[in-house]
UniProtKB/Swiss-Prot annotation:
The chain crosses the membrane at residues 27-47, 63-83, 89-109, 203-223, 243-263, 307-327. This is Divinyl chlorophyll a/b light-harvesting protein PcbA. The gene is pcbA. Induction: Transcription decreases upon iron starvation. Its main location: membrane.
Length: 368
């Protein structure tokens, strides 16, 4: 974290990042703990929505958020937007709750049983490989490679799931197996107009391309090191915990904005049967997405509306966090802004020169 050159900085208990900034073991423990919280939230919300699901109505008319995602993956015997067998969704919910407990145990194990700094393990050991310093580009690129590897494996899993199990096709109203269309010209052309994608084969082709691209990047970053001397142009003096957090928030903001606009307009990935109709973009106190379906209005919103608005504002605040931490990483001290306003308040200026007053200096000068 940015200390502005001070070595004796202390943080309050609620500054959670300070507890893991220079403790790589605790940093991993916090990651595992966060994963457990996400799993628990997913499982609990699935059970919550299942308890309120009305089998006489399509999912898209009930304003659910989690069930449409499971139905889109072909879980639950979905047909024309109606769940025909909810047992699969129940199994998914219970598995998430079980794994949340496993992750919680792993987080506590890494917090209380293992060393809080992985650098204390013997050189060359497996734990020591994942020890890092925020200004060490060699180790950070090694860890980045493993992140890319898991993202690539996630894309592979999604493509294979659609190929052998099937996903929901809104055009046919049933779950069907989808072969990916790995057409590089299609992938290139949909970089900008991805909102208009209307083919599940193209969607799977895009994920197949991402799987290859991410896996190649993972191999590159795991087995390579930055070329040449580590200079200021490559981040020397800037690479820090604040800088990494800033760039991470920028990436999260970008993905959140993409998800918001995609969910609001695309009806192939977000079928009307599952999420409600497309949305309008409106401007009041702030921009927002509004439902066009007459079933929703007032305090009742579609799943599409929830997803789009939540991701839009989440992306907005992520972007502010990116600027905040980015400026701190560059050395800007926000306390200087407070001092500036204090100085402005202490100066009295009159438009009438005869009545202008000067605030006496707080320092005492010796008599001359």
């Amino acid at each position: 974290m940015q200390t502005y050159g001070k070595t004796d900085v202390t943080y309050a208990w609620y500054a959670g990042n300070s507890g893991v900034t220079n403790r790589s073991g605790r940093f991993i423990a916090s990651h595992i703990g966060h994963t457990g919280l996400i799993c628990f939230g997913a499982g609990a919300n699935t059970l919550f929505e299942l308890a309120r699901y009305d089998s006489a109505l399509p999912i898209g008319d009930q304003g659910f958020v989690v069930l449409p995602h499971l139905a889109g993956l072909g879980i639950g015997g979905i047909e024309n937007g109606v769940i025909t067998d909810s047992y699969g969704m129940l199994v998914v919910a219970v598995f998430h709750l079980i794994f949340s407990a496993v992750y919680a145990g792993g987080a506590m194990l890494h917090s209380f049983r293992y060393k809080e700094d992985l650098g204390e393990y013997p050189q060359g050991s497996r734990p020591n490989k994942f020890d890092f310093k925020w200004d060490d580009p060699d180790r950070l690129t090694f860890i980045l490679g493993h992140h890319l590897l898991f993202l690539g494996l996630g894309c592979v899993q999604f493509v294979e799931w659609a190929k052998y199990h099937g996903i929901y096709d809104p055009a046919m109203g049933v779950v069907r197996k989808v072969e990916y269309n790995l057409d590089l010209s299609m992938v290139w052309n949909h970089q900008i107009d991805f909102l208009t994608i209307n083919s599940l084969e193209d969607v799977m082709g895009g994920h197949a391309f991402l799987a290859f691209f991410l896996s190649a990047g993972a191999i590159w970053h795991i087995f390579s090191k930055p070329f040449g001397e580590y200079t200021e142009f490559k981040g020397k003096g800037l690479l820090s915990a604040e800088f990494v957090l800033s760039t991470s928030l920028a990436g999260a903001a970008f993905i959140a904005f993409v998800a918001a606009f995609w969910a609001s307009m695309n009806t192939t990935i977000y079928p009307t049967d599952l999420y409600g109709g497309p949305l309008n973009i409106e401007l009041n106190f702030a921009p927002y997405f509004s439902d066009t379906d007459p079933l929703f209005g007032g305090d009742l919103h579609s799943a599409r509306s929830w997803l789009s608005n939540f991701h839009f504002y989440l992306g907005f605040f992520y972007l502010q966090g990116h600027f905040w931490h980015g400026l701190r990483a560059m050395g800007f001290d926000f306390k200087r802004v407070e001092k500036l306003f204090d100085q402005l308040e202490s100066n009295e200026i009159s438009l009438n020169p005869a009545k202008s007053t000067t605030v006496p200096s707080t320092s005492t000068d010796s008599a001359t």
